[in-house]
């Protein structure tokens, strides 16, 4: 069994009871954050791209014992600021106790708030506790999502905010390519430009045969 806790915006915490993985830990300064940095402990800290609302508290969490896993550029930046890191890139697979993760493409941009280049933006597929979870990061719809879907996804975490990423209509089209068993919308309602109705998206996903869950920050979805 794997627990998926939505922390707000694009931040999620995954655990199988042994390994704890946080993705895009934007907590400090996040008006929707369910937990603060002091309440989150992670073994692996996955960062899909360098924008501040995704890199977030990666360094602070690493200093508590976690390892930042991301692009070469982001990992190097994190190390310079005192984090432990594993530099990777698109297509690479990292194995850990109880599972693995693989970086896949995303269509977006990636730079730190100070303008430092963050490498290519990415999505990630995580296998943990026998479940496969796709976190799309920030992305537009793209046809190669079909290849990601061939990995056999138990859950897809998809941005629906529009403006900076795909919106609900494109995210629904993404479901046709990805064919996950379940979907959770992310990256919406944090700021005015990305206001969306998560429950309406989840309902439309269910109409397409995908189990949709619009989690509130702090809520947990269990994958049995």
Curated annotation (Swiss-Prot):
Family assignment from sequence similarity: Belongs to the UPF0173 family.
Identification of the protein by name: UPF0173 metal-dependent hydrolase TTHA1283
Origin: domain of life: Bacteria
GO MF annotation list: hydrolase activity
Entry keyword Lyase: no
Pfam families the record matches: Lactamase_B_2
Keywords linked to the UniProt accession: Hydrolase
InterPro entries per record: Metallo-B-lactamas, RibonucZ/Hydroxyglut_hydro, UPF0173, UPF0173_UPF0282_UlaG_hydrolase
Intrachain disulfide bonds: none
SUPFAM superfamilies: Metallo-hydrolase/oxidoreductase
KW Protease (keyword) present: no
């Amino acid at each position: 069994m794997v627990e998926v806790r939505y922390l707000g915006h694009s931040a999620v915490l995954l655990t199988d009871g042994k390994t704890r993985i946080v993705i895009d830990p934007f907590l400090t300064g996040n008006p929707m954050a369910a937990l603060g940095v002091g309440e989150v402990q992670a073994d692996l800290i996955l960062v899909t791209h360098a924008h501040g609302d995704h890199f977030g508290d990666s360094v602070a969490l690493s200093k508590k014992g976690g390892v930042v896993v991301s692009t070469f550029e982001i990992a190097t930046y994190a190390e310079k600021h005192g984090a432990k890191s594993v530099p990777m890139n698109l297509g690479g697979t990292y194995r850990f106790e109880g599972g693995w993760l693989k970086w896949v493409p995303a269509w977006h941009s990636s730079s730190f708030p100070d303008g430092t280049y963050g490498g290519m933006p990415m999505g990630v597929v995580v296998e943990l506790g026998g479940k496969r979870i796709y976190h799309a990061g920030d992305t537009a719809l793209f046809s190669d999502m079909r290849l990601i879907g061939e990995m056999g996804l138990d859950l897809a975490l998809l941005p629906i905010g529009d403006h900076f990423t795909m919106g609900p209509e494109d995210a629904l089209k993404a479901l046709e390519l990805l064919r996950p068993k379940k979907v959770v919308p992310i990256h919406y309602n944090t700021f005015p430009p990305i206001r969306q109705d998560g429950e309406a998206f989840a309902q439309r996903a269910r109409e397409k045969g995908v189990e949709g869950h619009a989690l509130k920050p702090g809520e947990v979805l269990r994958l049995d």
